């Protein structure tokens, strides 16, 4: 009887590995560079959707009372972070979703099979590191305290997520700790990048040029004034400007603009554009008669 039991146990032991190695139907476990690229694209797509909502927390725009989408946006405008409205998806969730995807790529892409000449393990990992840095940077400046050299070591920041662990309990790191992680990701990411400038149709991806732009912005917020200036001066000569005096000039905010360096953020929404109005404070900043930007950016619709 014992012998029969041993044989049965041995059969299960030998077969269990093969069973666990079976990929579930309809699922893809990334093993190739192209598959990790697709995974990272999910991270890119998760990142920018909240950006245009932040204008509602400034003095730039306000929701139109009575508009059909008014209730979807009013909580943002009045800084109501604990809204009873369950349809509101607050900005913190999108960057952390992007970070989840970047962590998946960072952990495993260097062992992936290179199945395309158009991408490399290094490029994909470099982009993932920079996207993770950008997401942490945005979160810190949304929910943490602004950087102050004298208190950053103790000022409350945001939780840092650099690994995939569904049981991990996240606690807020200090502002200095978050910046340390951001700079580490930027440094490693820039060392891995191989693409100087992405093609226009994939310009949401990080390149060597957009990585410089990101570090310049982070250095500025970190009050590294000289480093921020040096990085900006390194980049500016390769960035032409739109001449708004020409009829063929494009909107500098669009992906088609020759000014575009990184076209990642969603800066507007059809629903939001129709359900908000520009504040008098913002309009007052423009010379409405002579400023070319005014005619390009604003249109009167009766609201």
What are these regions (language model features)?
Residues 135, 216-218:
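Residue-level signature for tetratricopeptide repeat
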Residues 1-17:
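Sec-dependent bacterial lipoprotein signal peptides
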Residues 17-58, 62, 232:
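Membrane-proximal, proline-rich intrinsically disordered regions
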Residues 119, 142-180:
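Short coil/linker segments at helix-helix boundaries
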Residues 93-95, 119, 126, 158, ...:
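Start-of-helix signal in alpha-solenoid helical-repeat scaffolds, especially tetratricopeptide repeats
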Residues 99-102, 179, 186, 232:
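Inward-facing hydrophobic residues that define packing positions of alpha-helical scaffold repeats
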Residues 72-143, 191-193:
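Conserved, well-structured interaction surfaces
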Residues 38, 223, 227-303:
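Hydrophobic-face positions in mid-chain alpha helices that act as interaction patches
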